[in-house]
From Swiss-Prot:
Keywords: Cytoplasm, DNA-binding, Nucleus, Phosphoprotein
Induction annotation: Up-regulated by cold stress, but down-regulated by drought and salt stress.
CDD domains given in the database record: HMG-box_AtHMGB1-like
DNA-binding region: 35-104
Residue spans of biased composition, Acidic residues class: 124-141
Primary role: Binds preferentially double-stranded DNA.
Residue ranges, annotated region (Disordered): 1-40, 54-141
Organism listed in the record: Arabidopsis thaliana
UniProt protein name: High mobility group B protein 3
List of residues that carry Phosphoserine: 122
Tissue specificity field: Expressed in lateral roots, root tips, stems, cotyledons, leaves and flowers (excluding ovary and pedicels).
Basic and acidic residues: bias regions: 1-12, 70-110
A GO BP annotation: chromatin organization
Amino acid sequence: MKGAKSKAETRSTKLSVTKKPAKGAKGAAKDPNKPKRPSSAFFVFMEDFRVTYKEEHPKNKSVAAVGKAGGEKWKSLSDSEKAPYVAKADKRKVEYEKNMKAYNKKLEEGPKEDEESDKSVSEVNDEDDAEDGSEEEEDDD
């Protein structure tokens, strides 16, 4: 049985496998000022459904149960019953697109106010300390 590996040898080769980081891990940091994407019609429906479900089932605290019940209810609704939620979602989408245009326009103009933001906090503090003098360094006891 030449070439056969023991269990210990196969385990060690499995452990040596290197995993690649997730695709989005290296992406740029998210801008907190960027408008959030609008809710879909289903999520607009779920906002209302959660309230009514909690009133009918006050003891049920399971998020999964609420989601499952909401999904089943959404599937059972006709297109005419879904229409108000679709209209709300479309309204939010239009508002989002308007906000995104304003956001992108602001990005294209560039950072006018944050000219000094390229410096780190320590650099800014060092500059302030240099202007005040070096009173702290005179302790030669």
